[in-house]
Amino acid sequence: MKVILSRKGCDSDFGGMPGIIMPDDRIVYIPIPGDDFETIAYHEVNAGNGLGNLCDVISQVSLHMKMYGKKLEINPETKCHLDPDLDAGMYPRKSGWRGCFGQADAAQTVLKKAGVAEGDLFLFFGWFNRTCYKDGKLRFCKGQGIHMIFGWLQIEKVIYTHEMPV
């Protein structure tokens, strides 16, 4: 079995903000913004832990994100790229839903050449920052950023993008 560390979520170029560690230590993973091909908006994604939707939680700490290094306004229709998709409670699901994440093109080729296969384990890590309340508003605490593992997925089946039905 191989164990693969995979960085996911927002960074300084895509998203422009870390995932959120709430003052009570609840973790909020923030997927990167999506492009015009995405169908899921941040307001449709449950932030988990009784916090409401991702759009509302993100808007508490910032009104903007980044996409391709450019400022992106956060509003209920802002699309997100939900990858990895690990939590059945984040979005309405069809019966039989399974956790998944996607790699395409060069990234998929790297995994194939490395012999990544059924049974291997992905550990997902990302950039997170502690928050605190300042003047009654949720804000990121300066100097409290960390990289941490936030999820995992064991490969049940590999599906190559060129083999997917259209």
What are the roles of these predicted feature ranges?
Residues 2-4, 11-13, 19-166:
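Structured alpha/beta reader/binder surfaces that contact nucleic acids or chromatin modification marks
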